């Protein structure tokens, strides 16, 4: 069984097609969306979406956050920012991770620490998408 998936960012439509399942990080944890899933509307945390297409091929897209809407035959991901794994720059992601770690070590106060932690989580998520995209090739 399959369903239709649309992944849309503020800039463009990143994916539109028939899929077997997706995996994404919601506000309450990891979500696996299979055909016939109960209707759902939830926030998406920064991380990745793993798409298993109709014939088993996988694609990985980095999401900076957004909204997931699940209906019986259609799933829509409205992302703040979405970047395909192939389009991510590994050197840039490593540099972002290094800067965020330095910021955490030098943070002064809760707001500084929270902001640095969020930046670190985004950098780690990008690196994970890059790693999984390389493995899938």
UniProtKB/Swiss-Prot annotation:
Matches recorded under Gene3D superfamilies: ATP synthase delta/epsilon subunit, C-terminal domain, F0F1 ATP synthase delta/epsilon subunit, N-terminal
Membrane topology: Peripheral membrane protein
Domain of life: Bacteria
Subcellular location: Cell inner membrane
InterPro entries, alphabetized: ATP_F1_dsu/esu_C_sf (IPR036794), ATP_synth_F1_dsu/esu (IPR001469), ATP_synth_F1_dsu/esu_N (IPR020546), ATP_synth_F1_esu_C (IPR020547), ATPsynth_dsu/esu_N (IPR036771)
Assigned keywords, A-Z: ATP synthesis, Cell inner membrane, Cell membrane, CF(1), Hydrogen ion transport, Ion transport, Membrane, Transport
Predominant localisation class: membrane
CC annotations in GO: plasma membrane; proton-transporting ATP synthase complex
Gene Ontology molecular function, alphabetical: ATP binding; proton-transporting ATP synthase activity, rotational mechanism
Family to which this protein belongs: Belongs to the ATPase epsilon chain family.
Subunit field text: F-type ATPases have 2 components, CF(1) - the catalytic core - and CF(0) - the membrane proton channel. CF(1) has five subunits: alpha(3), beta(3), gamma(1), delta(1), epsilon(1). CF(0) has three main subunits: a, b and c.
Function: Produces ATP from ADP in the presence of a proton gradient across the membrane.
Name under which the protein is recorded: ATP synthase epsilon chain
Species of provenance: Yersinia pestis (strain Pestoides F)
